[in-house]
Amino acid sequence: MNRRTLLTGLASLPVLPLFSGFTLAADSPLSAQPPTRLAHPPSYWRDKVSAEAWKVLFEEATERPGSSPLDQFYEPGNYLCAACYLPLFRSEDKYDSGTGWPSFTQPIEGALGTKLDFRLLWPRTEYHCARCGGHQGHVFNDGPAPLGKRWCNNGVALRFVPADQPLPPLRG
Ligand SMILES: [Zn+2]
């Protein structure tokens, strides 16, 4: 936990209720239809993702800053949930926040749900994949204009698909 994260954590106030505003379709990942919410227990995903990814996604662990190859990575493409493959972010919205975690100015509409996290004494707004419920990261109010948001994501919880490759089918 670095100083920047401590300070920005204080500025992060409630934004949205959990899993509000679904707009993605399960059968058409980038379209504007609600995703089908999966009801699998965390154990369902154990053999489908790495041990490190599982801890982040289903035990809400946080990867060490600077540890993800996706942090300093700016190729064109889409960032999918590492568990269920729902597209969560586009490369156009990725930027270098200097925090050591992959950061985005906005998610794909409806791909994420948020809730307050009081784990660190002050509230932070954490967000989850709207389809499988996997924990991805936290959103802060110190992002670049005009949106002003920093969606701070664990790289290990993402799967990158280059723009010139087809998206894999959703799984789960
Ligand atoms: Zn997911």
Language model features: what each stretch is:
Residues 78, 126, 149:
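Residues immediately within or flanking Cys/His clusters that coordinate Zn2+
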Residues 74-103:
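Mid-length scaffold segments of soluble, non-membrane domains
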Residues 81, 129-132:
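Short cysteine-rich clusters marking metal-coordination/redox-active sites
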Residues 57-74:
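N-terminal post-signal-peptidase region of extra-cytosolic proteins
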Residues 90-91, 138-139, 161:
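Short, non-ligating residues that shape and space the ligands of small metal-coordination modules
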